[in-house]
Design a protein with these regions (language model features):
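Extended polysaccharide-engagement surfaces of secreted carbohydrate-active enzymes
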Residues: 137-140
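Active-site mouth of glycoside hydrolases
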Residues: 1-135
Length: 140
């Protein structure tokens, strides 16, 4: 799997393209919302996995790390921010430098709702489509 990911990142680089790399999808972190799971991450496992990925791709200059995976970072009693903090820290530790990171929220929302003050977040991301059956203009 990762050999194929390596090839795609390198191919994109030859065309001067950036890759938005999502380390995991949201249902692997929290299944209480939607998706089939299984939930496989704890903050500790997320940090280790992040370190693995950061080390593997430390030489790649065409990556934007996108944490999240179509989920709110906080939903009812579920707060996944500590897990995303751990994964972000692992990526940076593995890479040996601060990497460019954002968060993919659920449709019709911005990551700023839950994560705007997070030190690991470099810029907010907005998913404008398919949120509650309508597109959301970025300026709303």
């Amino acid at each position: 799997y990762f050999a194929y990911v390596d090839e795609l990142i390198d191919l994109a680089a030859t065309h001067e393209l950036y890759i938005g790399l999502l380390p995991t999808w949201g249902d692997k972190v929290n299944r209480n919302q939607w998706g089939v799971g299984p939930v496989v991450f704890t903050p500790e496992k997320a940090q280790v996995y992040g370190h693995f990925l950061g080390a593997r791709y430390r030489e790649k200059s065409n990556l934007i790390w996108i944490l999240g995976g179509d989920r709110p970072a906080v939903h009812d009693q579920d707060d996944s921010r500590p897990l995303w903090q751990a994964m972000a820290a692992g990526i940076d530790a593995g890479a040996g430098f601060r990497t460019l990171k954002t968060y993919h929220p659920m449709g019709g929302h911005s990551s700023s709702i839950w994560l705007h003050e997070e030190t690991w977040l470099d810029f907010n991301m907005m998913q404008s489509g398919h949120g509650r059956g309508r597109d959301t203009a970025v300026w709303e």
